From Swiss-Prot:
EC number: 1.2.99.6
Regulation: The complex requires PaoD for activity.
Primary site of residence: periplasm
Subunit annotation: Heterotrimer composed of PaoA, PaoB and PaoC.
Coiled coil ranges: none
SMART domains xref list: Ald_Xan_dh_C
Domain of life: Bacteria
Entries under InterPro entries matching the protein: Ald_Oxase/Xan_DH_a/b, Ald_Oxase/Xan_DH_a/b_sf, Ald_Oxase/xanthine_DH-like, AldOxase/xan_DH_MoCoBD1, AldOxase/xan_DH_MoCoBD2, AldOxase/xan_DH_Mopterin-bd_sf, PaoC-like
GO molecular function: carboxylate reductase activity; iron ion binding; molybdenum ion binding; oxidoreductase activity; oxidoreductase activity, acting on the aldehyde or oxo group of donors
Compartments reported by the entry: Periplasm
Organism name: Escherichia coli (strain K12)
Cofactor(s) in the UniProt record: Mo-molybdopterin cytosine dinucleotide
Annotated protein name in UniProt: Aldehyde oxidoreductase molybdenum-binding subunit PaoC
Binding sites annotated in the UniProt record for Mo-molybdopterin cytosine dinucleotide: 241-242, 468-470, 511-512, 615-621, 625, 688-691
Gene symbol of the encoding locus: paoC
Amino acid sequence: MKFDKPAGENPIDQLKVVGRPHDRIDGPLKTTGTARYAYEWHEEAPNAAYGYIVGSAIAKGRLTALDTDAAQKAPGVLAVITASNAGALGKGDKNTARLLGGPTIEHYHQAIALVVAETFEQARAAASLVQAHYRRNKGAYSLADEKQAVNQPPEDTPDKNVGDFDGAFTSAAVKIDATYTTPDQSHMAMEPHASMAVWDGNKLTLWTSNQMIDWCRTDLAKTLKVPVENVRIISPYIGGGFGGKLFLRSDALLAALAARAVKRPVKVMLPRPSIPNNTTHRPATLQHLRIGADQSGKITAISHESWSGNLPGGTPETAVQQSELLYAGANRHTGLRLATLDLPEGNAMRAPGEAPGLMALEIAIDELAEKAGIDPVEFRILNDTQVDPADPTRCFSRRQLIECLRTGADKFGWKQRNATPGQVRDGEWLVGHGVAAGFRNNLLEKSGARVHLEQNGTVTVETDMTDIGTGSYTILAQTAAEMLGVPLEQVAVHLGDSSFPVSAGSGGQWGANTSTSGVYAACMKLREMIASAVGFDPEQSQFADGKITNGTRSATLHEATAGGRLTAEESIEFGTLSKEYQQSTFAGHFVEVGVHSATGEVRVRRMLAVCAAGRILNPKTARSQVIGAMTMGMGAALMEELAVDDRLGYFVNHDMAGYEVPVHADIPKQEVIFLDDTDPISSPMKAKGVGELGLCGVSAAIANAVYNATGIRVRDYPITLDKLLDKLPDVV
C-alpha cells in the first residue's frame, strides 16, 4: 500500500478499540516472569555452552600477541574464538568498529576473544587466563582538546545557511552568545545485551535482544559472509533498548561464531561493566549558540553549532536539527563538527540529535527571554512558526506548540511563578519553576505485516516488529481488532521473528505509527478477501461484532472462513507527503525543583508534559512512554555522565553503581496531557510517535527551574552539586 495522499475517513476512525487506554497484553507474562528473553530459550536450545568475552585493555593500538593456551586447558573449556581462527569476517553496514578486534584495536573493551565452556563460571574463569600483549598507540579522548582541530563540517553534512546571520546577529537589539556542553551518556537498559545461537547445517537461528530485526539479520549475514536467507533472528521480548540495541553487537556475532565452532548452542551475555565500553553510547557535545532578537523580542538571527566526537568512519551527533525548525527567524546558520576520538563507538540513544540539542537550545531561549524582559512561555509563543523557516512555502502538517505551552502553563500554575531568581523558599529549600519546548521529527519507515483470520474467528498478527517495553503488542492488537471488528481478546500478536514480514522496527519514535500502519495495510487487504468470500463489495462493507455488513445483508467472519483460514500480507510505503509537509511532534515541559540552600541538592518536585503527537493510539501505554522519557530527562539533567579517563581512553563508571540513573523516589509527581492532534498527513493511522518527544526538552526545563530557584545558570550538564555550592545565595 502506498500512502501518498492525506488519509480520509477510514475504519480506524471508529475509535472503538484504538485510542482507548488498554492494559498491555504482554503485561501478565512479564510480571509473572514467564516472558522469555534472549538468554532464556532453554528448551529450544538444550545443552547450551556459554561464552565469555575478553575485551581489549587498551583503547588504540595493536594486539601483538594473544596467548590462549592456559585458557584452552582450563576445566570445561570447549574453544577460544579469536580473529585469527574465526575465519574471514565482513563488517556490517551499521557498525563503525569491528565486533571482533585484532590485530588492530579500535577502542577499549573491543572484543578480542570469546572463551566457550560448559558453564558460565568456567568460561569466565578461563577468560581471566587469556594473556594479551599490546602495542599502545597515542589516542584522542577529549572532545574539548580536539575541538580546535575541527573547523570544517563532515563531507555529507554541510552547514546550512539562510539569509544573513552575521549581519542580523550584529545588529540585533538583544542577543545571547554562549556555549553549552552535554556529556557522554549510556543507555543502561535493564536487560543486558544477550544472545543464543544454534546452527542446523548451514542455517543459523539466533535469539537476541535487538530492536531492529531486519537490520540485525542483514548485518549478521554480511559479517558471517552467509546468505541472509540462512539467518533467522528471534527477539520477541526486549528488556529496554533506548537505541543501544538498534544494531548488531558483539554478543550476537560471537554467539554465532562460537556455536559454529563447537557445534552446539552457545549463549553469550555482556556483563553490565562491559556494556558502556563494548557497545555504543550517546556522544558528548559542545554546542555554541548565538541568538539575536529585536526590541519586541522576535528572533532575527539564530546560529547553532555543535561539536561531537566519534571513531573514524563514525557520524556526528546531530544536535542542531531542532534549531532549524523550532522557532521563526529569517537569518539562520547551523553546523556540525566531528572530531576523531578513540573512545567507544558513539551512536543513537533515545532521541538522537534533538535530546542533547534541546538541552542547549532551550536554556539559550530562556536566557534570551530574560534579556528581552519577556516571560519565557510568552517568548516561545511569540517566536512560533507554522512553516519551515528555511522554506516558508512548506507548512507543518500539524503544529500545536502554542497550545502545548498555553495548556501547560495553565495546568501547572505558571502565573504564580516568581520571575526573579532565588526569591521563593520553602524552609531550607529554594524553589524554582522552569519551562522548555519539546520537539522531535516524525520519521516514517516502510513496514509490513501478515494477518490471519482463523476459522474460529480469532485473528493472528505476524510482523518482525519488536516490543522494547513500549506496548507494541497491544497497539498492534488494537489496530487489527478495530479494522476487523473483533474484540481485542480475539487478537493474538506474534513479534520479533525474521520469518515474519519486515517491519519498521523499534527506533526513532517511528515504531508505533509505522508498524500499526503496516497492520492497517494488511487488514485492508484481508477485509477485501473476507468481503469477496461472502460476495460483498469491500468498499461498502462494515466490520463489527465479528460480522461483516453490507446494507441489509450481513455474514459472520466464521462464514467467510468456511473454506479455511484467510491470510493477507501487505506493507505500507510512504510517498512524498513528508517532503511536501514538515512533520514533527511538539511538547511543553514544565518542572518545579527544590534546591537545598546549604547543600545544593536538587530535588525535582513535580513535572508536567503536554504533548501534541498525532493520534494517541493507546493513552495508557503512551503515558507510560512519556513518564519514562521524562525520568530519563531528569537523569540527563542532574546525574548521568560517563566519566572519561582521558589518559587511557575508556569510561570509568561503567556499571550501575557508578553511572547513576533516577529511581522512583527521585520524582514524586509526573503528569502527562495529550492534545487532540490527529494528523491525516502522517499515516492512515493519523498518528505519530511520542516515546522520544517525552525526553526532548525536559533537561533544559530542569536547568531553567534550577536557575529560577537559585539564580545560578549552569550550562554544563549534568547539574551536580559542585556547580552550585559556591554560588548559592546565603542561607537565611
